[in-house]
Structures are given as structure tokens and as C-alpha cells.
Amino acid sequence: MAIARLSVKVGKAGKAAPHAEYIDRDEEKKKKEEQAKTDLEHSDYGNMPKWAEHNPINFWQAADLYERKNGSTYREYEIALPREMNAEQRLELVEDFIQSEIGSKYPYQFAIHNPKAMDGKDQPHVHLMFNERLQDGIERDPEQYFKRYNGKNPERGGAKKDNTGKSYQERKTDIKDLRQRWADLCNSHLEKHQLDSRIDMRSYKEQGIDKEPEKKLLPSQAKDPEIREALQQSRTAYKGVVSGNGKYSTLRIFTPTSFNDIQHGIFA
């Protein structure tokens, strides 16, 4: 079953290059091929200035070094991809999403990971990180690129930063709209490949489903066999039933009330 999940994160100065190396699995790549164990399915980047067009890490290192201390060096979309799709179909979906959301505006880097989920099946997802300084065709060295924008003389200042000054409510609305655009695109690709699954980015409450959303586990928690078993039990405890009027509802048998409860197998 395709999973509906899209989260948005913001990276501060000093975090961009390490995160780019993490999603690109640089440490695994440095190991001998026969010893490397990586869940990296595909990675790529685009819209980089000339001084980073052959190595995106140069861009993120410059962002960490020259972006103002209280500024953001990147935004990241972490998105679950349909496990029903094969690797080629997933890449096509991601590239279409990047074309529609990023286009030629922002420098970006992405990586598709495909680790094993708790049920032993694939858990494909993409990390898409991008910098919101607009590409305007003006050549700037790394230091100038991240300076404040000069509206009167753009060539003298840094690249203009997009989407600044938005309120919390505006950002919240933007994310809701983004999730809907992703759902529409993802479902169109599922239909294109004649796959039955569809995703719905609405909350359980908005869908009329009586179910509490799961809390996201930390990587260390997800690897803990006791937590994995308890969470699997929790998931199977939800029995989906269809009511007489055709609407979907859920019968809740028990739910984990906290991570401590999950860890110790105690349910409400």
C-alpha cells in the first residue's frame, strides 16, 4: 500500500554539507564496494552555480560558511514513495516533482533511499534538499552568492532569497498545498502505471477515520526489535471496517500511548 507522507525541514548554517553527505551516503561510497551496505537507490543534483556544477558539496559547504548565522542554508522535502513502483518508475515520479516544484529556480540535490521497513518490504523515500536563493544568471563567487541581495544593482549583491517574510499561517498553507500537489502527481503516476494504490494527504480526522497518527520513530528506535514488534502489534490492532453507508471507519482495539509504552509493550 502506498504511504502518504511528506515532511518539510529547514537547515541552519553549518548543517547543509553534512546533511548532503548523509543523504548521498558518502561514507558508504568510500568503503570498498564489496563491503559497502547502502540503501541508496539513486542520487542527482541540478541548477548549481559554475563553481559547484561538478560537485554539489562545494555549494553546501559555501552555504554553511557564508550564509548569515541566523539564516537557512536549505529546505528539505522528505517524501515517501510508492513501494508498488519499481526503481525506474520512482525516479520518473521524483524527477517530475522536481521539475514542477523546483524547475530552474533553485540549486538542489536529491537522493532516493530504499531501506527495509518493519514488515520486511521496501520502504522507498526521497530526500530533496534545495536552497531558496534564486538562479538569476549572474555569476557570483561563493562568498558573494550568499550576501544580501542588492535590488538596485543585483550584480553587486548576493542571489535573491525567495519566500522570505512569510507568516506561520502562510507557511502552513503552503505546506498543505504542496502536499496536495504531491498527492495529485503521485496518484497520476500510479494510474499511469496501472497500479491500484492511491495516496491521500489529508489527516485521519479530515478523512473521517477514527485513528491516531503514529509518532515517527528515531532510527535507533526503528532498529530496536522490541519496539518494532510492539509497533507491528499496534498496527494490526486497527481493523478497518466499512459501515453500512459505505464510509470507511476503524475499530480501535488498542493503541500505543507513548514511546515508553511501545518500548515496554504496554498499550492503553
What positions do the PLM features span?
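N-terminal nicking endonuclease/strand-transfer module with a His-rich metal-binding environment
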Residues: 1-268
